UniProtKB/Swiss-Prot annotation:
Part of the accessory SecA2/SecY2 protein translocation apparatus required to export cell wall protein GspB. Part of the accessory SecA2/SecY2 system specifically required to export GspB, a serine-rich repeat cell wall protein encoded upstream in the same operon. This is Probable glycosyl transferase Gly. Belongs to the glycosyltransferase 8 family.
Amino acid sequence: MDKLENKSMANYDEYRAVVICASFSDCNQVLTTIKSIVCHNRFIKFYVINNDFPTEWFVSMQKKLAKLDCPIVNARVDASLVSNFKTDISYTVFLRYFVADFVEEEQALYLDCDIVVTRDLSEIFAVDLGSHPLVAVRDLGGEVYFGEQIFNSGVLLINVNYWRENDIAGQLIEMTDNLHDKVTQDDQSILNMFFENRWVELPFPYNCITLHTTFSDYEPEKGLYPPVIHYLPERKPWKEYTQSIYREVWWFYQGLDWSDIQEPVGALTQKMVEGEDDSSLSCLVYTYSCDLLHINYLIQALPSCHFYIAAPVVVAEPITRLLQYPNVSVSSDIAGIPALLESLEAKSQLLLDINAGDEVGDIIARFKSSGKPVFAFDSTVHGQQGQEVFPADNPEVMVQAIEKLGLAEPEERQISVLSIDQSLDYLLEKGASVVRFGDGEMDLIAGRGIPYQEYDPELSARLREMMAMESNERLMICLSDVFTGLERYSIDAQNFWKAHLQHHLADYLEICRAPWYGSTFISRPYIDLEDKTPSAGYFAKLKQLWQDKDLLIVEGLTSRSGVGNDLFDGARSIKRIICPSRNAYSKLEAIKQAVREHADNRLILTMLGPTAKVLVYDLVQEGYRALDIGHIDSEYEWFQMGASHKIKLSHKHTAEHNFDQDIEYRDDQAYDSQIVANLAQE
């Protein structure tokens, strides 16, 4: 087993092969897997290796997938394909052996049909297979239970050329014929025996087996899901009981209409799965017993409340019957799945202590320590643990209390943002660095790419982490000053921010818990202001930041900040590092190294979109001072023009004109002489 290396993450101009093997009895699962992939990816060529799918199914799928630039191939296996092999085993047992017989591409991603994909697959396809036959994720269950270093065969990146040239299918069929009755895990055992010490390891998130999360310290970025979720046979999400985490993710993709799948989404977010309205109440009953006092009455009296009923043992028929109600979920036999219980606790605002028999574990104490209420009847209460107790002969009283709990308005919390003046004064007084968060960064945090930066889960996680930080004398964290007083801005700006906050205010309130933030608008101090008279003072303070200082400007290829104006005339000297105008995050390490080589004691100014936030933060940890002041050049140009609206600049990048079209670069020897590194051309 070797460690993986990545190829260049270039844009794909060819199809990438995904292989699924199944019988038609699993067509609903195949459909769900395909929907999950095309929700986040384009230019995927699907090969469904099968022996019984109707032609009409493929005709229907071809029509749907063609609109998404994703063809599908009916890779049908029949007796003629295996006639040259001496075996008495049905070929349906080892359909995936035939990948190289159908796939035209050099590599193929094989996926079981009990899998959903929640992100762009580019990182997996970028793995360099070299001379290795396949890439896979280590099977943590095999390691924990049997001490075996094996891979799970549900996700395989296959070197198709290698398989074809070495007749891997023939060799695997021969081994299967000889050993099939001596192995415990069918073709997974055969594949591990055959490829022992010849496979490359892929990280756990790319085959996140729901039952194996207990054995891994991996946690997805907050608000997101693992890139590839794999549901094991005994606890499938399409069965009646909830017996694994991420069940709701499978049902989200299963329920997607094809009309819902338009532009690819970088990553599935919890908000997408749970919906915009997360105000509904949920409660948990955790029980050994099927005797739950007044449970039918409570469920019917509270149709807007969701009841999670869970048991560490297999539930009995009286519990199963409760699934007739749309506001009930049942989790059976979950004793060995702590992650599922934790998930149910997190979803529930209330614990109902209404079960006969013993309390399960310390569930009451766990809810109380989380600050969540526990309601009990006087005949079912388990000890005196701070429960709110209601009369068993009048369950309506408990219903009223639960309704009141659901109607309670959450405490209003305001996000405090300093004014532009206050923020600039802080930078001048403290000598702090600064990072600024705007609508583009929130889009990336929410799982969507923006015109000049593709979605990247690592970037998204880092942005979210920084947005939650408190400012200090070394680094000021800034937000857009739009949570109050929108009347300060132009009508267009007001409308934009109202729409933005309609979608993302809850995200800001969840993430941004620092006592105060600086203003992102320190570098946007003109065009969106209704009253533009203070702008001259703002620019004067900005210029004080670099007056008589040596500067290192880190910017995109088209930015050309300060070219053609006097914005940086007060600086002692200027050096520039030129970076890609798009997807600069892919060059982050190279950019940091270039900064180290040329920074000396210079003040670093960054104009590099979302990448600038991470760059500044990392540089501050290394002892540099850096200011993220993107868009400052466009704002200053408009200020000098006295513009009343956003005018496109002909000779360089213009804020909000994100595609950099029709730029006529002017020769500027001073600008050219300042460039000490050009990473945009590497």
